[in-house]
Amino acid sequence: FDPARPTCSGGTFVFHNECVGDRTGHRESRFFDTLENQIRKNGDTGRRLIIKMDIEGAEWDSLLGASDELLASIPQITMEMHGFDGPKILEVIRKLKRTFYLVNLHFNNWSCTSGAAPLPAWAYQTHWVNKRIGVIDPAAPVPAPMSPLNAPDSPTRPDCQLRTSRPEH
C-alpha cells in the first residue's frame, strides 16, 4: 500500500487513505472499505465509472464482496490481478465473466515464473468490458493480436506472454 498522493494538474484529485476490501473495518494498521462504499462516499453512485484497480492481491476479496448489481453498473474494469492458485481466483473469474468480456490479458514480465503454471506469471493486467456495451466480433482472430500497449513491463527482462499455435497453411 502506497499512500503517496500524486498530483493531477488541472483536475480534481481526492485521495482516500484507505484500502478496498470485502467489508468495512480496520485490519492490522489499515482501514478497509468496500468498493461500493468507496463509490458512494465519492458521490459517484449511479455514474458511469471506469474502475482502475491495482491492489496487490486484495482484488479477489473486494470483487467477491461487490454485488452483481454494482458490477453490472460498471462499463469497464482495468486491473492488475495477482495470484494463480488461490481458491478465490476461479470464483472471481467466473463472477466477472457473468457480466464482462475479458478483452485484454497481458502478463507482467516482472512476475514470470514456471511456478505459476499453467500461467506464465503470477501478476497479469486485464481489461474487462461489460457485456451490455461490448460486442463480440465473430470474424476477429482469437486471441486478438497483441497491442503495442502490451509492451513488457520491464524492457530488460524476458517476456512471458501466452502464445497460441497458429495453424500452418
Label each PLM-derived region with a short phrase.
Residues 1-169:
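Phosphate/nucleotide-binding beta-alpha loop and adjacent structural elements of enzyme active sites
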